[in-house]
Amino acid sequence: MNKTHLTQTKFADLPLEKSLISGLTSQGYEYCTPIQALSLPITLTGKDIAGQAQTGTGKTLAFLPAVFHHLLTNAQPENRRKNQPRAIILAPTRELAIQIHKDAMVLASMSNLRLGLAYGGEKVEIQRTKLEKGVDILIGTTGRTIDFVKQGVIDMGSIQSVVLDEADRMFDLGFIKDIRYLFRRMPEAKSRLNMLFSATLSHKVQELAFEHMNDPESIQIEPEVMTSVNITEELFYPSNQDKILLLLSLIEEDWPDKAIVFANTKHTCEKVWGYLAGDGLRTGLLTGDVPQNKRLKILQQFTDGEIDILVATDVAARGLHIPKVSHVFNFDLPDDCEDYVHRIGRTGRAGEKGLAISFACEKYVFNLPAIEEYIKHPIPCSEYDKNAMLDSLPVMKVTKYKAHPNSRKDNYHRTHKR
């Protein structure tokens, strides 16, 4: 745990339940990030918020302590039934829901509040069995949650707190009708603690907050600083045919402890993964086509250090919270400016330093002006020497969706041109 703190506000100085402070302290959390320092004093009084903050700013620990504190300091509704959770946290992707659940487990163990998960891609009976025993806090995606509501497995009639995480992404993925479906089945907004977090507080996000929340207070974390000061950005202009060789050369030069390579399409991700894995690098592939059980296994291997490099699409990687990612490579410049910020936000977290390297190739260089306008600064450009790059491409692996935890860096030998 890196002890670097971004504010002077301590969790222990906030009016949190002592058990929650103990849980946070046990995980090394002492000081608040800006989003936590601004939001918790508001939500701990029971007031709603709509918060704008980028990925990697500590949003999860801005809302989890507030939810737990609210349930611990307020009596549960009279005549509450077993199938009625007291709080619901909704995320746009199953990976983010799983990560939030993982972060919540420590607080749950210190407070005796029961957690439940609801997301697609896993056998429904496993989740149903857990929910039928009764949970206090349900964490999930909208689709599977609605399925359980329609089946009577859960009922929204006793909800006392609601969190919408990455609300802008929910709009992008077309989930807002689902969100409204669930809101209509909850008690009125005035009887709940409501929290919304989004990378942007666009008009449509603010409209959602106005419609389903109780006069939320808007908070923004330095919106003019779109990228973290902890991230060093670097830009190369490779030709299309040089991209793979340049990527391999940069990886060999730096030997990242933990890196994520982003590409714009599933096909490109598979190709990049094939060359990296074929070169003996411990590499995992994360796209929407990878079966859920394999995705979870690959993510765990990456988190545990059994895999050094993750090749991913934006949809598959959005919302992931993986500590100590040292490098992010934009193999393709994204078409969406916000995706650039989300991608490089995988590194430089919690005070750690990170490096974000982007390739402006012939196909995607036209995305660069809009990205630089959005982040309000030019990305520093570096040149590469073709004569210093690797001689040739490795044989590309064709077996898909498999990580390679058994190969080792010290077995990797390549020849440079000199």
UniProtKB/Swiss-Prot annotation:
CDD domains: DEADc, SF2_C_DEAD. It catalyses: ATP + H2O = ADP + phosphate + H(+). A motif (Q motif) lies at residues 9-37. Residues 243-390 form the Helicase C-terminal domain. GO terms for cellular component: cytosol. Disulfide bonds: none annotated. Keywords: ATP-binding, Cytoplasm, Helicase, Hydrolase, Nucleotide-binding, RNA-binding. GO terms for biological process: RNA catabolic process. It is an enzyme of class 3 (hydrolase). It holds the Pfam family DEAD. SUPFAM superfamilies: P-loop containing nucleoside triphosphate hydrolases (SSF52540). ATP binds at residues 53-60. Its EC number is 3.6.4.13. A motif (DEAD box) lies at residues 165-168. GO terms for molecular function: ATP binding; ATP hydrolysis activity; RNA binding; RNA helicase activity. Residues 40-219 form the Helicase ATP-binding domain. It is found in: Cytoplasm. PANTHER family: ATP-DEPENDENT RNA HELICASE RHLB, ATP-DEPENDENT RNA HELICASE RHLE-RELATED. Belongs to the DEAD box helicase family. RhlB subfamily. Component of the RNA degradosome, which is a multiprotein complex involved in RNA processing and mRNA degradation. NCBIfam families: PRK04837.1 (NF003419). DEAD-box RNA helicase involved in RNA degradation. Has RNA-dependent ATPase activity and unwinds double-stranded RNA. This is ATP-dependent RNA helicase RhlB. It comes from Psychromonas ingrahamii (strain DSM 17664 / CCUG 51855 / 37). The gene is rhlB.
